[in-house]
Amino acid sequence: IEGNLVKYITRHYKKNGKEDLEKAYHYLTLGDTFNCYWLAPKNISRSFFIEELNRYANANNITELEYSVIYECLIGDRNYGMRVLRTLIDNYDEYYKK
């Protein structure tokens, strides 16, 4: 589920735009429905995970808000991450007008 979150957030610029962010949100709600949540492996430190997420975000031009969604949904406050994603979807044209 979280893999699809990352995939759709990363590719939305190049593929289906707002529809991809809506798919990411859909997968998060599925995770909630089925109580299916990703847990970081115990042998991976939080700092290592953050370093790798930063590297991934830089390599894929992830915006600060998109980064926040991924970070919060994976190792932070999932509900907050979902609210940020919902805001990105609801304000897609305004936020991504470039």
Predicted features and spans:
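Intrinsically disordered, low-complexity regulatory regions
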Residues: I1-K98
